[in-house]
Amino acid sequence: MAGLVDFKNEEEVKEYLDNLGTEYSYQCFKEKQPDGCNRLAEYLENIKKNFESAAHILKINCDENEHSESCYKLGGYYVTGKGGLPVDLKAAYSCFLKSCNKGGKKSIDSCHNVGLLAHDGRVNDEKPDALKARDYYIKACDGNFAASCFNLSAIYLQGAQGIPKDMNMALHFSEKACNLGHVWGCANSSRMYKLGDGVTKNDEKAESFKNKARDLHKMQQERTPQI
């Protein structure tokens, strides 16, 4: 069929990829499409392996267009120092915050990352901000990001500055993390029910969560490639 690329033909593949780059460049620079700029950055990163140019496009698209996915990706570049950018957690935090507040495919991941960076204090002169971390973990947990739900359970399990210990809330978020497939969410829920740790003791629920933790752990091991 005319127009289809023979992906076994090296010359056709090269021409196809070059045309993609031209198309995305046109979308970004001529048509001023934020989505086109994001596609161009992905093309530069994944096809051309030109991380410096990808970082440049991501920065423009995040700073000028506040494109959620580009801000998320740029935040990751700042975390690792990729694409010639300096390792700069405050810049990463700003990128993730934009992405989280903007919404989009990676906004939930970005909200979780804002929570992480606020939680460990490295973007606030080594002063953890548990309240801000909680607020952004809640946003991510509401979007069914399991790790954020688990981190919320840990905050309420131990208490933090400005956040009193609350075993009912700890159990609530631990159970949600478990239901989203987080092994330790299941394990902690099981333990709390087994010991009656701040909640009504319930051996049946303890066993149920224990079995779920075991099943999830087994599934994870099966998915992990064996050497």
UniProtKB/Swiss-Prot annotation:
Compartments where found: Mitochondrion intermembrane space
Alphabetically ordered keywords of this record: Mitochondrion, Repeat
Per-repeat ranges for Sel1-like: 34-66, 68-104, 108-145, 146-182, 183-218
Main location: mitochondrion
Keyword Mitochondrion on entry: yes
Gene Ontology terms: cellular component: mitochondrial intermembrane space
Coiled-coil region(s): none
Family from the record: Belongs to the hcp beta-lactamase family.
Its job: May be required for assembly of mitochondrial respiratory chain complexes.
Protein name: Cytochrome c oxidase assembly factor 7B
Organism field: Xenopus laevis
The encoding gene: coa7-b
